[in-house]
Amino acid sequence: MENLHNRILEEGQALSSDVLKVDSFLNHQVDADLMYEMGTYFKNYFKDHNITKIFTIESSGIAPTVMTAMQMNLPMVILKKQGSKILKGDVYQTTVHSFTKGTDYELTLQKKYINEDDNILIIDDFLANGEAALGAARLVEGAGAKVAGIGIVIEKSFQPGPKLLEEKGYDVYSLARIEKLEKGIIKIKK
């Protein structure tokens, strides 16, 4: 996705060999036109996967997921990371380790938003170690539903997540694949 690649190279900041800051268009300030284009790419790739719902993890995956759900005319479900008095009782939960924050959290899904007939597309902003995507997949599969695919905005190809998801047999489609990060240097796989 050329527009995304350009934005990463022009506005992204490699803060270290494993941290890429893209808050000017993805996860603090959001470029709605770019999100819409991402939705188009995800829709075109996953259109024949018989998707019934699209899941994302709060919060940075929400914008591209909304645009994808709108274009595919499908319901979207936000998996919760934060505890809530409202989310009690009939829920699926799994523990996930956050690469970015270096902490664990309980990923939560209300049971009423998934059934065994669902084919779920999971969309997330980054793929690094694969923990978030695997946590979402555990919730989906724990409910007896199927992970039909995983859409990633930015994949860090040099980290273990992409290989891990591939080894588990998931169909992963990444809009941008980062080959290498060094302080001040970003190299994108073409």
From Swiss-Prot:
Q: Which Gene3D superfamilies match?
A: 3.40.50.2020
Lineage, top-rank taxon, reads: Bacteria
Annotated positions binding xanthine: 20, 27, 156
Q: Single GO cellular component annotation?
A: cytoplasm
Q: Where does this protein act, in terms of pathway?
A: Purine metabolism; XMP biosynthesis via salvage pathway; XMP from xanthine: step 1/1
Q: Return one Gene Ontology term, BP aspect.
A: purine ribonucleoside salvage
Q: What is this protein called?
A: Xanthine phosphoribosyltransferase
Query: Which organism encodes this protein?
Result: Clostridium botulinum (strain Alaska E43 / Type E3)
